[in-house]
Amino acid sequence: YYSGYDRTFNLSGINVYGHGSDISFPNVDVVYGYRKTDVFGLGGVFLSDWFILRYVLGYFSTIDKNNSIERPSSFNPVYYDSLHFTYPLMEEAKYFQSTFQIETELPFGINLVAQYFSHDTLTYSSDSLPVDQEIDIPNLEIDPNEMKPSNFFTPGMGVPLAILTDRAFFLTLDKEMLDEQLKLSFTSMIDASSIDKKEISSDGESSKEHSSKGLLMELKMTYSLNQNLDGTIAITKINGDSSHPEGDSYPFNQMEDFSHLRFELKYFF
């Protein structure tokens, strides 16, 4: 059991400011905060001569304790001197996460680690955001038609991957050679989530389940130049999903530009 505040901030509400009684040119201020989260965890390990199995389950109960977000305007407070509207979200949610992992050694001294991760929001509640115009939030474009607080909910504790997807497969293969001076590794992450996709035909509008196709792969080689210095070369490739219903908002589509080739030198003191 663990209780604490989330490590990542969340959308806590929106304030609308004006100049005196005039709200002709309002300033919309987005307020962030950190939810309080209680965590209940359960895990187990099974060992055999051939493989190792690990399982971890976490149940999370989180609440935004900011019942009031009233405060002076952070932008030009001399002009925007009056708070006209305030919309605290007061989020509450319960969600769970689980990981199942198997570790084994393959022929030729290759180590394999395979993992399945899942996340599900069990319940969610919040106040509404009665906003009828587009709002500019850093790194987030909000369409009034999609202005549902549940669309912006992200877990603040647990596996960080839950921000990207609710289900994923991991696979890691690595091998050490030359008296453990050289290490080769291959890592992949496959998005296994699904989402309803609306389709319009002559028979009307229908909903069809779409399986996500996001994929991340990395091939890495690390060589120990001496006891204190390692050199690494790695290639990372990220594939999105051009047919995903979320379009450019799909996280793997956003990450495609982060595909790269990198070189590293690490010195250990």
Predicted regions and their residues:
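Outer-membrane beta-barrel translocator domains and adjoining extracellular loop/strand segments
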Residues: F9-Y17, K65-S74, Y124-V131, S188, ...
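Residues that define the transmembrane beta-barrel architecture of outer-membrane proteins
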Residues: K36-F40, E92-S98, T165-F169, K213-L215, ...
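Transmembrane beta-strands of outer-membrane beta-barrel pores
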Residues: Y2-D6, S48-W50, Y59-I63, Y116-L122, ...
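Long, internal scaffold/assembly segments composed of regular secondary structure
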Residues: Y1-K94
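Extracellular loop and loop/strand-boundary signature of outer-membrane beta-barrel proteins
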Residues: P26-V30, Y79-L89, P155-P160, I195-S207, ...
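Outer-membrane beta-barrel "beta-signal"
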Residues: L171, N253-F269
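Repeated loop/turn-to-beta-strand initiation elements of outer-membrane beta-barrel proteins
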Residues: W50-R54, G109-V113, D179-S185, Q227-I233
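Outer-membrane beta-barrel architecture
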Residues: G43-V45, T99-E103, T172-D174, K220, ...
